[in-house]
């Protein structure tokens, strides 16, 4: 019903974006979602709400680039809590000092930590999902292809943090 009314007022993509926000309203932080979309995109794209941010998140997106057409809810950060673990309210953290490249649907469940160092590139293709409490640390470049799912509490690093001096 809501989607039909919105589709009359707005084009289909914008109506779907707003409908997603209302569908998951218990888990979406509306202020962060609206602020982030209008900060990073022109108004016509921001109204599609390509980035949806859940409650209990700490996000610094830095540079973000879409390598695909912008659609509603392409990036879902912490909007799908896991009730089995900690009532699904573990803090999701994204600290991006580099560049994030998005190639399609990208979902992070609650508790995920993504840290991207200055000058580093973290790129994901279409249909990528990170499970609860997973970690990604990118110092140079991490590239993830299509149809990738990472289970709970997994880690991806492109460094071992052991530095060698001459």
Residues covered by each model-derived region:
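Acidic/polar low-complexity surface segments
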Residues: 79-80, 161-166
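Domain-scale signature associated with acetyltransferase and cell-envelope carbohydrate enzymes
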Residues: 1-157
């Amino acid at each position: 019903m809501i989607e039909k009314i919105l589709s009359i007022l707005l084009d289909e993509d914008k109506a779907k974006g707003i409908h997603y926000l209302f569908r998951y309203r218990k888990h979406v932080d509306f202020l962060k979602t609206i602020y982030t979309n209008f900060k990073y995109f022109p108004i016509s794209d921001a109204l599609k709400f390509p980035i949806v941010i859940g409650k209990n998140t700490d996000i610094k997106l830095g540079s973000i680039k879409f390598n695909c057409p912008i659609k509603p809810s392409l990036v879902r950060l912490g909007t799908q809590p896991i009730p089995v673990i900690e009532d699904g309210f573990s803090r999701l953290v994204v600290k991006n000092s580099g560049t994030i490249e998005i190639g399609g649907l990208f979902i992070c469940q609650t508790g995920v930590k993504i840290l991207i160092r200055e000058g580093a590139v973290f790129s994901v293709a279409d249909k990528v999902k990170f499970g609860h409490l997973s970690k990604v640390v990118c110092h140079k470049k991490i590239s993830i292809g299509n149809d990738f799912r990472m289970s709970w509490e997994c880690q991806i690093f492109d460094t071992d943090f052991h530095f060698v001096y001459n």
